[in-house]
């Protein structure tokens, strides 16, 4: 069985230590809730815009909205 001895040098930083030290303060706020509505209104605006985007895509897919100059028949797709 192949085994490998790892250096146990306490002064040597592991590869992800820099990222860990940057992200640790963000995790310190875990579970705390800011008073008030915060960014809920902004989230609602983005959800509404995304819903409008989905409706537009659905209408284009169902050919409810026809674009001028864009062929919508399968015959134009075939070579």
From Swiss-Prot:
Post-translation changes: Phosphorylation is a light-dependent reaction catalyzed by a membrane-bound kinase; phosphorylation occurs on Thr residue(s) in the N-terminus of the protein.
InterPro entries: PSII_PsbH, PSII_PsbH_sf
Keyword Phosphoprotein: yes
Subunit structure: PSII is composed of 1 copy each of membrane proteins PsbA, PsbB, PsbC, PsbD, PsbE, PsbF, PsbH, PsbI, PsbJ, PsbK, PsbL, PsbM, PsbT, PsbX, PsbY, PsbZ, Psb30/Ycf12, at least 3 peripheral proteins of the oxygen-evolving complex and a large number of cofactors. It forms dimeric complexes.
PANTHER family associated with the record: PHOTOSYSTEM II REACTION CENTER PROTEIN H
Taxonomic source organism: Klebsormidium bilatum (Filamentous green alga)
Cellular location(s): Plastid, Chloroplast thylakoid membrane
Keywords: Chloroplast, Membrane, Phosphoprotein, Photosynthesis, Photosystem II, Plastid, Thylakoid, Transmembrane, Transmembrane helix
Physiological role: One of the components of the core complex of photosystem II (PSII), required for its stability and/or assembly. PSII is a light-driven water:plastoquinone oxidoreductase that uses light energy to abstract electrons from H(2)O, generating O(2) and a proton gradient subsequently used for ATP formation. It consists of a core antenna complex that captures photons, and an electron transfer chain that converts photonic excitation into a charge separation.
GO biological process: photosynthesis; protein stabilization
Any one GO molecular function term: phosphate ion binding
Membrane topology term: Single-pass membrane protein
Protein name, entry field: Photosystem II reaction center protein H
Gene it is expressed from: psbH
PTM annotation (Phosphothreonine): residues: 3, 5
Residues that span the membrane, as ranges: 41-61
One GO CC annotation: photosystem II
Similarity-based family: Belongs to the PsbH family.
Predominant cellular place of this UniProt entry's protein: plastid
């Amino acid at each position: 069985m192949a085994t490998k001895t790892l250096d146990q040098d306490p002064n040597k930083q592991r590869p992800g230590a820099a990222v860990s030290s940057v992200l640790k303060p963000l995790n310190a706020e875990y579970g705390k809730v800011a008073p008030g509505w915060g960014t809920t209104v902004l989230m609602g605006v983005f959800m509404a815009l995304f819903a409008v985007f989905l409706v537009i895509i659905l209408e284009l897919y169902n050919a409810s909205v026809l674009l001028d100059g864009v062929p919508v028949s399968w015959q134009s797709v075939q070579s």
